[in-house]
Amino acid sequence: MSTQEPQKSLLGSLNSNATSHLGLATNQSEPWCLYVSIPDGLFLSLGLVSLVENVLVVIAITKNRNLHSPMYYFICCLALSDLMVSVSIVLETTIILLLEAGILVARVALVQQLDNLIDVLICGSMVSSLCFLGIIAIDRYISIFYALRYHSIVTLPRARRAVVGIWMVSIVSSTLFITYYKHTAVLLCLVTFFLAMLALMAILYAHMFTRACQHAQGIAQLHKRRRSIRQGFCLKGAATLTILLGIFFLCWGPFFLHLLLIVLCPQHPTCSCIFKNFNLFLLLIVLSSTVDPLIYAFRSQELRMTLKEVLLCSW
């Protein structure tokens, strides 16, 4: 953590330490290079918003027994993953601000250990977030294409085993990543994992969208409704699909592009320019943790009603 230019080192190895180990030409300066400086206050504000949102989601699902189903378990775990991202960002930003102000004084070794701990926490939450986004897509796919068998396929014991497995994989992978961040194979594994999740979500949601349009067409023909109604439904579905996948790609894509470029062109001036915007890529991931509750949780009327009761009781 630098006091001159605080690094939100989601895997600080990638932003500062790894640049020297991997030979990244981060000191090169080009007049055309676009660098976006991210204020600490923006990290802190967005992290706090995400923190509040995801805490509310976890409380609502925990409180309402009607929400104790596999689907909401996955949504709750996604909220916990995003919550870990928020806590990590808020904690690291607060420590940086306290160090800069001279309020907090700590040895370099202690700061580095804390930074590594936060890096593991953020990396683990990133992996788990991607996993739960993928498993939510699978759950929705099964609920549509295997509706009659859904409750026999997606059972609570299976859901719990999947949740435990994802958390264990996230912990192990984050520890290995921080330990072996110098090896390009580790970076390529992470990029491949992201592309696999992106492909999985795109295929499943596109198939669900196609089935929904076919279903709408059948209903329209059955009730002799106008063609424009079916087209309107399909356009609405296409917009929803575009927003869902678009937000996922825009928020997560730049960070994994950063990892890929570290492997492909570590010393190229254009890549060096992109490396300088690491904090912007991290901010987009925090933005994703802020948007996820709006997409996956708050659209549920049952959850919104529970949340309303919780807020009214708290007052």
UniProtKB/Swiss-Prot annotation:
Annotated TM spans: 36-61, 71-91, 117-138, 162-181, 190-209, 239-264, 278-298
Lipid bilayer topology: Multi-pass membrane protein
Glycosylation sites: N17, N27
KW Transmembrane helix (keyword) present: yes
InterPro entries with a match to the protein in the record: GPCR_Rhodpsn, GPCR_Rhodpsn_7TM, Melcrt_ACTH_rcpt, MSH_rcpt
Keywords of this entry: Cell membrane, G-protein coupled receptor, Glycoprotein, Lipoprotein, Membrane, Palmitate, Receptor, Transducer, Transmembrane, Transmembrane helix
One CC-aspect GO term: plasma membrane
GO function term, MF aspect, one: melanocyte-stimulating hormone receptor activity
GO biological process, one term: sensory perception of pain
Cytoplasmic topological domain: 62-70, 139-161, 210-238, 299-315
Extracellular side: 1-35, 92-116, 182-189, 265-277
Task performed by this protein: Receptor for MSH (alpha, beta and gamma) and ACTH. The activity of this receptor is mediated by G proteins which activate adenylate cyclase. Mediates melanogenesis, the production of eumelanin (black/brown) and phaeomelanin (red/yellow), via regulation of cAMP signaling in melanocytes.
Subunit structure as annotated in this protein's UniProt entry: Interacts with MGRN1, but does not undergo MGRN1-mediated ubiquitination; this interaction competes with GNAS-binding and thus inhibits agonist-induced cAMP production. Interacts with OPN3; the interaction results in a decrease in MC1R-mediated cAMP signaling and ultimately a decrease in melanin production in melanocytes.
Family affiliation: Belongs to the G-protein coupled receptor 1 family.
Name by which UniProt lists this protein: Melanocyte-stimulating hormone receptor
Organism expressing this protein natively: Mus musculus (Mouse)
Gene: Mc1r
